[in-house]
């Protein structure tokens, strides 16, 4: 049986979403993706219903006084408190800290499965964008069982809450649309998962 993880569009969409959440919009990884989302052609390539994508596509193209790099800095870097921190342990740890127990559990799982994933900087591995990039890499390398585990155990327990808060506080139409696109896409993935999503308490 072919699972959704074995389709090319899973790896592509995971890599696109992961890059847009992880890298600056001016970076060589994401600048072409940003330009693609500002046009209409991408909708035909995205594995979601066109009717659901139409309002998202319109929002991507909505003008904002704040530049995209400024919005990315505010949402992902600081210097002020991030409105929706993109690290899993901030949501899963009672103290809402980086490098929390959930991060350590992810590291242990990666070690047990022989997975090495280089982070851009000295930051936790449970960054939302990084986990999507890792999911894409696992799917591209035929490691579908590990990809399902990553999604069900280490991403989906907290990502819906993260995305809800991210969308509400994005403050920029491009990133609000990106959050909505991610929420729609991940909900479709979750509906097709074979293994159940781990139930974990959230503290934000």
Swiss-Prot record:
Example GO BP: chaperone-mediated protein folding
A Pfam family annotated for this UniProt entry: Nitrate_red_del
Source organism superkingdom: Bacteria
Keyword DNA repair carried by entry: no
UniProt-listed SUPFAM superfamilies: TorD-like
Entry keywords, A to Z: Chaperone
GO molecular function, one term: signal sequence binding
Family classification: Belongs to the TorD/DmsD family. DmsD subfamily.
Biological function: Required for biogenesis/assembly of DMSO reductase, but not for the interaction of the DmsA signal peptide with the Tat system. May be part of a chaperone cascade complex that facilitates a folding-maturation pathway for the substrate protein.
Descriptive protein name: Tat proofreading chaperone DmsD
Lineage: Bacteria, Pseudomonadati, Pseudomonadota, Gammaproteobacteria, Enterobacterales
């Amino acid at each position: 049986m072919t699972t959704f993880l074995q389709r090319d569009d899973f790896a592509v969409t995971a890599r696109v979403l992961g890059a847009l959440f992880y890298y600056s919009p001016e970076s060589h990884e994401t600048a072409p993706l940003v330009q693609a989302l500002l046009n209409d052609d991408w909708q035909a390539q995205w594995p979601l219903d066109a009717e659901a994508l139409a309002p998202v596509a319109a929002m991507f193209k909505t003008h904002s006084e704040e530049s995209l790099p400024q919005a990315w800095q505010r949402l992902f870097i600081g210097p002020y408190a991030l409105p929706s921190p993109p690290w899993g342990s901030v949501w899963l740890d009672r103290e809402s800290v980086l490098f929390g127990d959930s991060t350590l559990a992810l590291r242990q799982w990666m070690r047990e499965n022989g997975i090495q994933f280089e982070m851009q900087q000295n930051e936790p591995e449970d960054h939302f964008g990084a986990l999507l990039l890792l999911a894409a890499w696992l799917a591209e390398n035929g490691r579908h069982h590990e990809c399902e585990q990553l999604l069900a155990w280490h991403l989906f327990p907290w990502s819906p809450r993260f995305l809800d808060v991210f969308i509400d506080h994005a403050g920029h139409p491009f990133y609000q649309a990106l959050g909505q696109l991610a929420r729609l896409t991940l909900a479709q993935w979750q509906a097709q998962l074979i293994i159940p999503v781990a139930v974990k308490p959230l503290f934000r």
